[in-house]
Design a protein with these regions (language model features):
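Charged, glycine-rich intrinsically disordered N-terminal tails and low-complexity linkers that flank
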Residues: 1-62
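Mg2+/Mn2+-dependent nuclease catalytic core
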Residues: 82-84, 89-151
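Detector for Asparagine
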Residues: 3, 40, 45, 49, ...
Length: 151
């Protein structure tokens, strides 16, 4: 069997927007120039720190209470590994020869034990209308695909 193909949600999005760019990246290791996402990284870290604070106390985040989310941040010994860009979570299919993986932002646990994979997104808008944004722009569809990949 040839080398296993590593896939991630970023790979899927890259393929959907530019198949040639994806092949250049995956097969020939030629990467397009990219912009730094320092603001998003900072927001992710702030959110992770807040979730960790409530995770240690086994309490819901105040926003969970405000928005009637029946959950607490999931307490698991591997949470830091799952959230790391270098390790993340992986599903390996030996039959299809691929490794699909990526880092998550957080996991929450509902009172019935069900887990919710959470992905934090930042916006500069004061009033964010998800339905309007989803219908008007393409980028939210990538977020939806991302969450579907976690299922």
């Amino acid at each position: 069997m040839s080398n296993i193909i590593k896939l991630s949600r970023t790979t899927v999005e890259k393929y959907l927007s530019c198949p040639r760019c994806c092949v250049l990246d995956k097969k020939f290791k030629i990467k397009p120039p990219s912009l730094p996402f320092t603001l998003n990284i900072a927001v992710d870290n702030l959110c992770k720190n807040e979730f960790d604070y409530y995770r240690k106390r086994n309490k819901p985040h105040p926003l969970f209470l405000k928005h009637d989310i029946d959950a607490v941040p999931f307490n698991h010994e591997e949470i830091d590994q799952w959230r790391s860009n270098f390790t993340g979570i992986h599903y390996i299919s030996k039959e299809k020869n691929y490794d699909f993986g990526g880092a998550i932002d957080d996991v929450w646990q509902k009172s019935n034990g069900e887990l919710i994979v959470a992905d934090v997104k930042a916006t500069s808008k004061n009033n964010f209308d998800w339905a309007e944004t989803f219908n008007k722009y393409e980028y939210p569809k990538a977020y939806k695909r991302q969450l579907e990949m976690y299922q």
